[in-house]
Amino acid sequence: MASPVQALLLDMDGVMAEVSQSYRQAIIDTARHFGVSVTHEDIDHTKLAGNANNDWQLTHRLVVDGLNGASSAPTLEAVTAQFEALYQGVGNTLGLCELETLLTPKGLLRELHRRQPKGMAVVTGRPRKDCAKFLTTHGIEDLFPVQIWLEDCPPKPSPEPILLALKALGVEACHAAMVGDTVDDIIAGRKAGAVAYGVLTPQTYAKSILEQTPAAIGKVLEQVGASVVLTPGLGELLDLVPAVPTASKAPTVNGKSGVREANISRVTKETSISVKLSLDGTGKSKVSSGIGFLDHMLTALAKHSRFDLELDCKGDTWIDDHHTTEDCALTLGEAFDVALGDRAGIARFGSACVPLDEALSRAIVDISSRAHSEINLQLVRPSVGELSSEMITHFFESFASAALXTLHVDVLRGRNDHHRAEASFKALAVALRTAVKHDATAGVPSTKGVLA
């Protein structure tokens, strides 16, 4: 039986930091400065070969190779200087570092930190100042009292960075896990005796979905020792490193432990709606809204969220679809809010990318009790079936408003509006399923101590 994980060691770039527009762009632009064309695929290929944890050296290698080893090739020092000018910025010109974003939700990182008896460490090939700036910018420096940088020792795939982190955390290798996106990360972790978890970058993950083929890097990471390959955001770590609760308690609704369901009725001069919703179902549904395409979408939502849903609506569809669609969304959102109860013991965050043929949609949910939505479906046709395109967007907005959740839904690509819309509803369903998942160790998943 595997030893329980007591400490997490996280790489930074591609794991916590989105660097496609910063470090990677600096590689491409630096190479261009010296007359060499480098693509993201070239960078991936070089990193896949290993021994590529230092981006200055990696850039120099790509430039020299691109110039076929010519005597006029720049020195490592010259390449490093150009790289740093682009990344850090010069004078009034902002550096590419300003484009970096946090890949892993801050709330998830804090929950993972809470679960680790020995804590968490950053083990990165970044220089100290770049690592510190990113952690401070995103307000997570307190989660990583141990930080191993480029200056500390030989870089991965050497096990030395891992061993230094383990020593500082006071944990045996067999009780620690290294999380990284490159073969160097995995090899270093395994050489040090730790468990190794691979992770796909957002670009690699999106490409694998669009092409409907497994990511090649995932197979390679497994071959060099990764026990599992995670998707961007690291949400699966909640299943891999569960904490032992001191007092396990299922989510409660109005004092009834373990019951997460609601019956809501809404009657106006325009519609009469009843909704019965169970968050712990199997995806059964019985939907009759009076709008065929809306029924189709709500059936898909129930199926892929694993919610049991009964919805019946009598609305003034002889006028148009506005009142019926909006009120169905509001009633369903209210039922969702009531079924959640005090929100204790849930994961809170959920995200999903879901394809439907050529279409790819992404949904991100935060059950925050702060109603907000950003919806971009890129629909072209005036309607899909009897449901107007503007009301498809408005459905998501109304649901988020009544459910008291933050919701982002984006169509990343697609040509067929039916596919765009359906992929969006399915992405929302999968994201909701993750967000409401029972987590006995989470307590109230907010540093405020309340989600209300």
Swiss-Prot record:
Belongs to the imidazoleglycerol-phosphate dehydratase family. Pathway: Amino-acid biosynthesis; L-histidine biosynthesis; L-histidine from 5-phospho-alpha-D-ribose 1-diphosphate: step 6/9. Residues 1-233 are annotated as: Unknown activity. It catalyses: D-erythro-1-(imidazol-4-yl)glycerol 3-phosphate = 3-(imidazol-4-yl)-2-oxopropyl phosphate + H2O. Residues 234-452 are annotated as: Imidazoleglycerol-phosphate dehydratase. Its EC number is 4.2.1.19. It comes from the Eukaryota. It comes from Phytophthora nicotianae. The lineage of its organism: Eukaryota, Sar, Stramenopiles, Oomycota, Peronosporales. One of its GO terms (biological process) is L-histidine biosynthetic process. This is Imidazoleglycerol-phosphate dehydratase. The keyword Electron transport does not apply. Coiled coil: none annotated. Keywords: Amino-acid biosynthesis, Histidine biosynthesis, Lyase, Multifunctional enzyme. The keyword Amino-acid biosynthesis applies. It is an enzyme of class 4 (lyase). GO terms for molecular function: imidazoleglycerol-phosphate dehydratase activity; phosphatase activity.
